[in-house]
């Protein structure tokens, strides 16, 4: 079982590397790590397990956060209508994104960042993702709102980008007009 001790923190070089694509068939280790990542997210959202194991609540995690610079991630997040998006995605790519932008009212956080970083992180409000499941089956997935923000945050990790790289340095509280605000 993964715990917070397995997650690397900001400053670790894996968080700034561009991760390499996985090849199929996946190794048993890659499959297990993907499943363990999803299990971590599920456990972190369970109040009792989170307290017992000292887990910070998370809705997404990427392999580089575990010092594995390969292109896969897990998300376990509900949208505004309580629909669950629970996936382990290998080699995810953003196929298309909306012009409409969105952000979280309280900014973003990250399991690899142990401090609060104030500021808006403006992202696309909708994205379409091409990816593969652990068996190499191609997937085309659409996300909007909060789940779209989460998936973009995790894909950024695969490209060596941290959420705070998107914050306006001169004015972190600047919010461009017509941005949808969630949360």
Curated annotation (Swiss-Prot):
- Give the EC number(s) under which this enzyme is classified: 3.5.1.88
Tell whether Hydrolase is among the UniProt keywords: yes
Q: Does the keyword Metal-binding apply?
A: yes
Gene Ontology molecular-function annotations: metal ion binding; peptide deformylase activity
Cofactor (UniProt)? Fe(2+)
What's its catalytic activity?
N-terminal N-formyl-L-methionyl-[peptide] + H2O = N-terminal L-methionyl-[peptide] + formate
Report the cofactor remark.
Binds 1 Fe(2+) ion.
Q: Which domain of life is it from?
A: Bacteria
Annotated binding of Fe cation, by residue: 110, 153, 157
What NCBIfam families does UniProt report for this protein, alphabetically?
A: pept_deformyl
Q: Check the record and name the HAMAP family matching this protein.
A: Pep_deformylase
Q: Which PANTHER family match?
A: PEPTIDE DEFORMYLASE, PEPTIDE DEFORMYLASE 2
Q: What is this protein called?
A: Peptide deformylase
Gene responsible for this protein: def
């Amino acid at each position: 079982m993964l715990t917070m001790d397995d997650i690397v923190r900001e400053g670790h070089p894996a968080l700034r590397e561009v991760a390499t694509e996985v090849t199929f068939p996946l190794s048993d280790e890659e499959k297990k790590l993907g499943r363990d990542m999803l299990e971590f997210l599920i456990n972190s959202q369970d109040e009792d397990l989170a307290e017992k194991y000292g887990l910070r609540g998370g809705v997404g995690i990427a392999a580089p956060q575990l010092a594995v610079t390969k292109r896969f991630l897990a998300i376990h997040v509900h949208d505004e209508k309580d629909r669950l998006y629970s996936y382990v995605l290998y080699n995810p790519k953003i196929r298309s994104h909306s012009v409409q932008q969105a952000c979280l009212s309280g900014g973003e956080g990250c399991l690899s960042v142990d401090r609060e970083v104030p500021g808006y992180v403006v992202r696309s409000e909708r994205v379409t993702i091409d990816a593969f499941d652990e068996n190499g089956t191609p997937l085309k997935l659409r996300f909007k709102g909060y789940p779209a923000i989460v998936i973009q945050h995790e894909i950024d990790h695969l490209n060596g980008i941290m959420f705070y790289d998107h914050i306006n340095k001169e004015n972190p509280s600047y919010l461009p007009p017509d941005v949808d605000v969630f949360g």
